[in-house]
A protein has these predicted regions:
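Non-catalytic cap/lid and distal C-terminal segments of serine-dependent acyl enzymes
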Residues: 1-155
Length: 155
């Protein structure tokens, strides 16, 4: 719904092209990844900052999915980046930055699960673990220009 309706509204209000990029931070990064995977070809470039990539496999994600979608673990897969990739969704390439001092890194973000899924699926993942950075907006602002350059090169 977001990918279709929001893009339609933007296209009506502004001069746009079909080349689009999507990015986000934390849960917004999760949203960017799942939207891109669910709508192949809609986005020319995809990146994320510290996304939760496998909510069905981590405590906070399981709690949130249970709250929003109920107890059916199978329904959760449509909202889980790693599960979508395991189920056949594909991107050509992907940029993800994550801070190695992020307090959510080991229990919630689990980038190694994304690495394994992308490797198995042949997705070109650039995963950069940024030394000393946490989950803050300072982290995002530090690497935002890199992401903009990444997207610009693909649009």
């Amino acid at each position: 719904m977001i990918a279709r309706e929001l893009i339609g509204l933007i296209d009506e209000a502004f001069p746009t092209t079909k080349a689009r990029a999507i990015s986000g931070h934390s849960m917004g990064g999760h949203g960017a990844l799942t939207l891109a995977l669910k709508h192949p070809g809609r986005f020319s470039s995809v990146s994320a900052f510290a996304p939760i990539v496998a909510p069905g496999q981590v405590p906070w994600g399981r709690k949130a999915l249970r709250h929003y979608l109920g107890e059916d673990d199978a329904a959760w897969r449509a909202h889980d980046t790693v599960a979508l990739i395991e189920d056949g969704a594909r991107l050509d390439e992907l940029l993800v930055d994550i801070g190695d001092a992020d307090p959510f890194l080991e229990k919630e973000l689990r980038p190694e699960l994304l690495e394994a899924a992308c490797e198995a699926a042949g997705i070109d993942l650039t995963l950069r673990r940024q030394p000393g950075y946490d989950h803050s907006y300072y982290f995002i602002s530090t690497f935002m220009a890199d992401h903009l350059r990444w997207h610009a090169a693909r649009l």
